[in-house]
Amino acid sequence: MSRVPAHFLGRAVALGTIAGGVIAVDQWTKSWALHNLSSTSPRHILGPVYLVLSFNRGAAFSLGSGVSPVIEALASLLAVAVIAFSGRAARIGASPVVVVGLGLLSGGALSNLADRLFGDHHGAVVDFIQAVSWWPTFNVADAAITTGAVTVAVSLFFFSRPKAAHPDQR
């Protein structure tokens, strides 16, 4: 029986904890929004930020809202792909920054997918944050997905180290 490398366990636990935290916070804030917000009376928070209840049948930031069944299928595939990639990244020893980004991305994807599949909103995701008037409403999961994707991209682009050449290739 082979042992699981400690770096994999640590990264897997960190990734799972971050993803679980995102899911918990996102689902709690969506529940709060459903019980406390209206779609017709935005609640001013600070500066250009308002809270207003909306239901998004599209992808993040309401993209593709007219093709809900396609979005549901793509969201499901994307969530599975992100989780598979996250597991692989943890297994091969991805940097802690990449693990954090993947945890945010995984948690956001899974939470929005849970909304689509198990929520009472006919395949829609609950959105409630309006940062500026010209930008679509979003939720904590959307923010986590965006932050996670940017974190992973920046980390891989700016901080990834090239692999050392094999001695025979020098």
Residue ranges and their predicted role:
Residues 1-170:
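Alpha-helical transmembrane bundles and membrane-interface segments of multipass inner-membrane proteins
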